[in-house]
Design a protein with these regions (language model features):
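Glycine-rich FAD pyrophosphate-binding loop
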Residues: 45-68
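Mobile, glycine/GP-rich and aromatic-enriched active-site lid/loop segments adjacent to catalytic centers
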Residues: 119-202, 269-463, 542-566
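Extreme N-terminal leader/targeting segments of oxidoreductases
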Residues: 1-26, 44-45, 49
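N-terminal Rossmann-like FAD-binding beta1-loop-alpha1 element of flavoenzymes
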Residues: 26-53
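Glycine-rich active-site loop/strand segments that organize a redox cofactor
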Residues: 73-106
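Long, amphipathic alpha-helical stalk/connector segments used for oligomerization, subunit docking
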Residues: 487-565
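Glycine-rich loop(s) and the adjacent beta-strand/alpha-helix scaffold that form part
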Residues: 224-284, 467-480
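Core beta-strand elements of the Rossmann-like FAD/NAD(P) dinucleotide-binding domain
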Residues: 21-24, 211-221
Length: 566
């Protein structure tokens, strides 16, 4: 909704918007990988008399964390066992996980990866003599499903040419669910409980970001998958770099906030993810560590990770710190340890890595390798490639600095915060991990609110899903929601609020602005309201200084937390 000071050409907001009311059996809120998985899967199970609607605040082709593309799929079990996948996730998140959710996902995630390849996603392949083939060359070796071997950069990761990854997945979802069942450019802001049935989801309300319109949507069951939370903490990129973050800036924490406000239980929200990335451009480091075999150095040029001091520090966190693979959070801890000891900054030794790989390659292969170093960024973080150009950085000639980012809240990467959801209804799953509906049945990924499901970043205690796992969780949720809607076919959602009350709720910021913007000489500064940007800066300042942001090396105290809560 545009305000009167918006650039010429935008539609100005009005006091009384148009209202559109809808009612469906199944409502999907979100347009990222999880929601695309749900959109693709739902019609396989949907009855002829059942209806579905997907609502996205953006456009599905470039919505969610994968919008800019990826250069790898980080979760593909393949020849490994789901039990080993559970062990890996448990170790990386230092035991704070739901093994039932992780195991169940590990049994299903590969099917989504096979679908991605079937839809046209180029996946790198390994030849019999150990050569790596990317793009169309890799496709000639066949599919993963038919037995072709992927190029592994680790035990679980596979390389892709993924600039258009999200577009490929979104197209499949849109074709499956049907364009008539998709509502884009609609920002859902509140979930609504049923007026008669206690603790039962009944609908949602939101507004169009293109028109002066409010949407009120009733439903029997709903999935909310709107990503994690970014810009809670002040990013390292400020000034003209404002808006550059690692996770997508449009992940506003809606998944957690909206579900929490209707009573859904949260879990592990104290678990924040702080990835190490190339400084300022937030470029990914995974391919450099795993594919190019690069090492990190401290400011003295020492490979600190294997030093006696580092080993002694890791032993404090045994058994996780002494495991064969050091957990992500402890690798970051070692970086901070070096910096606090005065041995910073931390450097990615790209020069040595490419030189070592080049010893076994001819000139053509080496040139291709150098191109892949750039494409790794162009596939998923264009800003980092721009930064390398602006600073005359050639990775084969000049090393780059890496740095832990500001903290993010998420549940699909190397973090595990989110909503408490039901595990699968298997005998070995503890009863306290199963959430039963009022009919006594268990519906996997249902939250503590009846009929409210989630996936991807929304599922707490189950990290390391990444893009493929989020898509698979969306597909699992689709089947469970259809089952729920069929089991409660006689349920008629009834909203406690009137249409007028919901419009007042959604358009209160607009009306407050229209009533008061002429009071001051500049619309950004007014004693009667605060604009979103001003609210964001206040939140960032508080978390940055008191809430364990980068300003305090990610540390806080009980007194600091009391200040921020005030």
């Amino acid at each position: 909704m545009a305000l009167p000071n918006a650039p010429t050409g935008e539609l100005k907001a009005v006091r009384d918007p148009e209202v559109e009311e809808r009612e469906v059996d199944i409502l999907i809120v979100g347009g990222g990988m999880a929601a695309c998985g749900t959109a693709f899967e739902v019609h396989k199970w949907l009855g002829d008399d059942q209806s579905v609607l997907l609502v996205d605040k953006a456009a599905m082709e470039r919505s969610g964390a994968v919008a800019q593309g990826l250069s790898a799929i980080n979760t593909y079990v393949g020849e490994n066992a789901p039990e080993d996948y559970v062990r890996m996730v448990r170790n990386d998140l230092m035991g704070l996980v739901r093994e039932d959710l992780i195991f169940d996902l590990g049994c299903h995630v590969d099917d989504s990866v096979h679908l991605f390849e079937e839809w046209g996603l180029p996946i790198w392949k390994k030849t019999d003599d150990g050569k790596n083939l990317d793009g169309k060359k890799g496709q000639k070796l066949g599919t993963l499903k038919s037995g072709a071997q992927p190029v592994r950069t680790g035990k679980w990761q596979i390389m892709i040419n993924g600039e258009s990854y999200k577009r490929i997945v979104a197209e499949a979802g849109k074709l499956a669910i049907g364009e008539d069942n998709i509502l884009e450019r609609c920002f859902i802001v509140e979930l609504l409980l049923d007026a008669n049935e206690e603790n039962q989801i009944a609908g949602a309300v939101g507004f169009s970001v293109r028109e002066n319109k409010v949407f009120i949507i009733k439903c029997k069951t709903m999935m909310v998958a709107c990503g994690g939370a970014v810009n809670i903490y002040q990013p390292r990129s400020v000034g003209e770099g404002k808006g550059r973050a690692w996770y997508p800036v449009w992940n506003a924490g809606s998944t957690y906030t909206m579900c929490m406000k209707v009573g859904a239980e949260l879990t592990m929200m104290e678990n924040r993810f702080t990835p190490a990335r190339f400084k300022d451009g937030y470029g990914p480091v995974g391919a450099w560590f795993l594919l190019f075999k690069a090492k990190t150095l401290n400011g003295l040029g020492e490979p600190y990770a294997g030093s006696d001091a580092a080993k002694a520090e890791l032993e404090k966190y045994a058994p996780y710190g002494t495991a064969a693979i050091t957990p992500t959070c402890l690798r970051n801890h070692l970086m901070l340890f070096e910096m606090k000891e005065g041995r910073g900054p931390i450097i990615m030794d790209t020069v040595t890595a490419l030189a070592e790989l080049g010893k076994t390659m001819d000139k053509k292969e080496l040139k291709h390798l150098e191109s892949e170093a750039w494409e790794d960024f162009l596939d998923m973080t264009c800003g980092q490639a721009n930064l390398w150009c602006a600073t005359d950085t050639e990775p084969e000639k000049k090393n780059s600095e890496i740095m832990p980012t500001e903290p993010y809240l998420l549940g699909s990467h190397s973090g595990c915060c989110g909503l408490w959801t039901s595990g699968p209804d298997y005998d070995w799953v503890p009863e306290e991990y199963k959430i039963k509906a009022r009919n006594g049945k268990v519906y996997k990924q249902m939250t503590t609110v009846q009929g409210l499901f989630t996936a991807g970043d929304g599922v707490g205690g189950s990290g390391h899903k990444f893009s493929s796992g989020s898509h698979a969780e969306g597909r699992i949720a689709a089947k469970q929601m259809v089952r729920y809607a069929k089991d409660f076919a006689d349920f008629t959602p009834t909203l406690a609020q009137s249409k007028e009350e919901l419009v007042d709720l959604v358009y209160k910021p607009v009306r407050t602005f229209l009533d008061n913007y002429e009071y001051s000489t500049h619309v950004d500064f007014n004693p009667n309201y605060i604009k979103p940007e001003g609210m964001m800066y206040r939140l960032m300042k508080a978390t940055h200084e008191y809430g364990a942001g980068t300003a305090t090396y990610y540390m806080t105290t009980s007194k600091s937390l009391e200040i921020i809560m005030d």
